[in-house]
Swiss-Prot record:
Part of the Tol-Pal system, which plays a role in outer membrane invagination during cell division and is important for maintaining outer membrane integrity. One of its GO terms (cellular component) is periplasmic space. Belongs to the TolB family. The lineage of its organism: Bacteria, Pseudomonadati, Pseudomonadota, Betaproteobacteria, Burkholderiales. Residues 1-26 form the signal peptide. The Tol-Pal system is composed of five core proteins: the inner membrane proteins TolA, TolQ and TolR, the periplasmic protein TolB and the outer membrane protein Pal. They form a network linking the inner and outer membranes and the peptidoglycan layer. This is Tol-Pal system protein TolB.
Length: 431
């Protein structure tokens, strides 16, 4: 039995790509720039009492806004401006800022802080409110991300994703690491380290767990890792191969791809490892399941038509309704991912000898390539649906890249120092 038959299409590609290259002290630095031709000018003053902090909150806020590609940071000078100060909004508008942020960090002892800020619209000459956040030495970065999220939503009308997290796999020498980081690639933590490959990380809807496939027992087994406690447990160790975990929207069930009876088929299993149930009933390879946001459908890859294409079936399985083909642009399509609003389908299409990220409008069926890279894999939507994170190759290296989901700007390579990184998954909004 071939490796493709054993693991399905994506597991084959992932296990090959993740084995190529190595990383030494790799760190992901996320950069998403040039997203729009019009950027919102904003000035964020230094917060009062920031001196001596292990993390400068205003630096994090400015970096987040700039990285989104939606904002231009106007120089606010070096003088701290607390949220209680009287602000001349007209003067800031004259400096080119359409919004202004002021704030303070109050030291409460024992490494505890209270962060207050206020956001102003300098055009309408009015306050847009603010937040009061509690933080400690280790959560100052999170507080900065939350402030940037507030600004993003108030000024653009879309919820920000700066406080979300990423997961990805880095290979360092002969060791694989599943890492969890902030959305900017900083503050990375190692969730699992192994001498065997790790693939297919998938975030739970709550953002507290990650399911993944580990080869540490010399075969692919699906695990769930509880991030707050560090505890992990097997979810699927069936006969043959276990791969491609995908969470249901309620977090109670995972769809998995198993070769339990020969060719890889899709099953569902409870998140505690019980209740195994077969969902597809074909003699072909069915793999890479992904739930629609409303939980009604499972999208998956199958070669039942002769070559890999994306199909959709009821979440209860083919016994509840026949699977229907979804992709018709291109002869080889894999790795389905549905946007959080259920309107878009991201997938990988083989075109011109390479593999490119496509996005399809699920209502009209219109599909377009949105990248200029040629070895794309593992697409993952941001929680607000505005960006897609994916793995590709650039300059002979395995890298991550991010691109607007509407294709309005070229993809930006995420800088990884000295190494190979793959298998990205963008986490949900934190609850």
């Amino acid at each position: 039995m071939s490796l493709m038959t054993k693991l399905g299409f994506r597991a084959l590609v992932a296990s090959c790509l993740i084995a190529a290259g190595s990383a030494a002290n790799a760190q992901v630095n996320v950069l998403i720039t040039g997203v729009g031709s019009t950027q919102f000018p904003i000035a964020t003053a230094n917060f009062a009492n920031e001196a001596g902090l292990p993390q400068q909150v205003t630096s994090i806020v400015r970096a987040d806004l700039a990285r989104s590609g939606k904002f231009t940071n106007i120089d606010a000078g070096s003088t701290p401006v607390p949220e209680t100060a009287s602000v001349d909004l007209g003067a800031w508008k004259a400096k080119g800022a359409n919004a202004f942020v002021a704030g303070s960090v109050n030291h409460e002892g024992n490494g505890q802080y209270k962060i207050n800020f206020i956001l102003y619209d300098t055009v309408k000459q009015q306050s847009l409110g603010g937040l009061s956040l509690s933080a400690n030495d280790t959560t100052l970065r999170t507080a900065g991300h939350k402030i940037a999220d507030y600004i993003y939503q108030k000024l653009l009308g879309v919820r920000g994703v700066f406080a979300t997290r990423l997961s990805y796999v880095i290979k360092t020498g002969n060791r694989y690491q599943l890492q969890i980081s902030d959305s900017d690639g900083q503050n990375a933590r190692i969730a699992l380290s192994s001498t065997e490959p790790i693939i297919s990380p998938a975030w739970s809807p709550s953002g507290t767990k990650v399911a993944y496939v580990s080869f540490e027992r010399k075969k692919p087994i699906v695990y769930i890792h509880d991030l707050p406690t560090g505890r992990r447990y097997m979810v699927s160790d069936q006969k043959g191969n276990n791969s491609a975990p995908a969470w249901s929207p309620d977090g109670n069930t995972l769809a998995v791809a198993l070769s339990l009876t020969g060719n890889t088929q899709i099953y569902s299993v409870n998140s505690n490892g019980g209740g195994l149930r077969r969902l597809t009933q074909s003699s072909s390879i069915d793999t890479e399941p992904f739930y629609s946001p409303d939980g009604r459908w499972i999208y998956f890859t199958s070669d039942r038509g002769g070559a890999p294409q994306i199909y959709r079936m009821p979440a209860q399985g083919e016994s509840a309704g026949a699977a229907q083909r979804v992709t018709f642009t291109g002869s080889y399509n894999t790795s389905p991912r549905v946007s959080p609003d259920g309107k878009l389908l991201a997938y990988i299409s083989r075109t011109g000898g390479g593999f490119k990220l496509y996005v399809q409008d699920l209502q009209t069926g219109a599909a377009n390539a949105i990248t200029n890279t040629n070895r794309d894999e593992s697409p993952s939507f941001a929680a607000n649906g505005q960006y897609i994170l994916y793995a590709t190759q650039s300059g002979g290296r395995n890298v991550l890249a991010a691109v607007p989901s509407d294709g309005s700007a070229p993809p930006q390579i995420l800088s990884v120092q000295g190494g190979s990184v793959r298998e990205p998954s963008w986490g949900p909004f934190m609850q």
